[in-house]
Swiss-Prot record:
Glycan-linked positions: N31, N61, N84
Post-translational modification note: Glycosylated.
UniProt-recorded name of the protein: Protein STIG1
Name of the encoding gene: STIG1
Signal peptide extent: 1-23
Organism whose genome encodes this protein: Nicotiana tabacum
């Protein structure tokens, strides 16, 4: 009971105490939140990449899109596609399988840039590149399913 009384006393004391804020002069405000390393990194970044965006927000600026695509192709050795402001691998992406915008049908998966039914394909049984032994048949994603 004493603990509860003490807790109530602390809450009442804190709630009646005025809150003071410390103001930073306008000239020093920028320096209070950044440092020279951040400034250098941000100034270098502005020339190389588009500004950061909120999650789920896309830019309507075609320059941003072209920059993402060029960066994507430059950094990746695989076949890539610039799709929805991101870089995708066309050898494994089911929404861009083999080429940009080619969507695999429901129940199929993109394996090596080709849409395959992994439930029936002997060369991609259950997952990409899972080859059934000679004489075995892929059924329901398993080699020689009984």
């Amino acid at each position: 009971m004493a603990f509860i009384n003490l807790l109530i006393l602390i809450i009442l004391t804190l709630s009646s105490t005025p809150i003071t804020t410390m103001s930073i002069p306008e000239t020093n405000r920028r320096n209070a939140t950044t440092n020279s390393y951040t400034d250098v990194a941000l100034s270098a970044r502005k020339g190389a990449f588009p500004p950061p965006r909120k999650l789920g927000e896309y830019s309507t600026n075609s320059t941003d899109y072209n920059l993402i695509c060029k960066t994507c192709k430059r950094l990746s050795e695989r076949n890539t596609c610039c799709f929805n402001y991101s870089c995708v691998d066309v050898s494994t992406n089911r929404f861009n399988c083999g080429s940009c915008g080619l969507v695999c049908n429901l129940g199929t998966r993109c394996c090596g840039g080709i849409c395959v039914d992994i439930q029936k394909d002997n060369g991609n049984c259950g997952k990409c590149s899972n080859v059934c032994s000679p004489g075995q048949k892929c059924s329901f994603g398993f080699c020689d399913y009984a």
